Swiss-Prot record:
The complex is composed of two ATP-binding proteins (CcmA) and two transmembrane proteins (CcmB). GO terms for cellular component: plasma membrane. The keyword Mitochondrion does not apply. Belongs to the ABC transporter superfamily. CcmA exporter (TC 3.A.1.107) family. Its EC number is 7.6.2.5. PROSITE patterns: ABC_TRANSPORTER_1, ABC_TRANSPORTER_2, CCMA. It is a peripheral membrane protein. NCBIfam families: ccmA. This is Cytochrome c biogenesis ATP-binding export protein CcmA. The keyword Plastid does not apply. It comes from Gluconobacter oxydans (strain 621H) (Gluconobacter suboxydans). Residues 17-209 form the ABC transporter domain.
Length: 211
């Protein structure tokens, strides 16, 4: 994990993230237009908006995987990212896939596996896991990181109702410890006191730029 001294001092206690007037283009297409938001300890923000509104792009920009064309993303601590890909090596067991994350992180592998009902699968090659089991394994990697800020892009893909409930319990526990998260999802999450941030469709702006 990054040393705390590598991050700026939060402007207020508990602040984990400031996104200030972020604009992103993809080629000639305007994807995000002046997005601003803040995230504090205990927050759970759900990104809403139509398909193509830039929800995944915003998460990638916050994570540092892409740079904004204008504006600024200010993080005050480490983050953990869950993208669309589960990123498991098929020939390695579940335990082997998560070993590096455990080594680099600060949380217990056994605790993460138990919380996500994966303990009985540790010696199974990843190629034999179901899509839901792979998704839970990817989420275990987020838990192992020890980061306070979680960016979760469609975390419930492939999960059944029971697994979504487990995920909700893990997310609630993370918030209770001072963590926070930004989530994109197409299904309701079992979380209380969430905030929503709507990203509008910019299709009309795209037509303007390309005309």
């Amino acid at each position: 994990m990054t040393s705390p001294s590598d991050f700026p001092t939060p402007p207020v206690p508990g602040r984990l993230l400031d996104v200030e007037d972020v604009t992103v283009f993809r080629g000639d297409r305007l994807v995000l237009d002046g997005v601003s938001l803040t995230l504090d300890a205990g927050d759970a923000m759900i990104l809403t908006g139509p398909n193509g509104a830039g929800k995944s792009t915003l998460l990638r920009t916050i994570s540092g995987l892409r740079r904004p064309d204008s504006g600024e993303v200010i993080r005050y601590g480490d983050l953990a990212w869950l993208g669309h890909q589960d990123a498991l090596k098929p020939g390695l067991t579940l335990a082997q896939n998560l070993a590096l994350a455990e080594k680099l992180g600060t949380n217990s592998l056994s605790d993460a596996l138990e919380a996500l009902d994966l303990t009985h699968l540790t010696d199974l090659p990843a190629r034999l896991l179901s899509s839901g089991q792979k998704r839970r394994a990817a989420f275990a990697r987020v838990m192992l990181s020890g980061a306070l800020l979680w960016l979760l892009d469609e975390p419930t893909v492939g999960l059944d109702v029971a697994s979504i409930e487990r995920l909700g319990a893990v997310m609630a526990a993370h918030r209770a410890k001072g963590g926070a998260m930004i989530v994109t999802t197409h299904v309701p999450l079992p979380l209380d006191n969430t905030r929503s941030h709507e990203l509008p469709s910019l299709a009309h702006v795209e037509s303007f730029w390309l005309s």
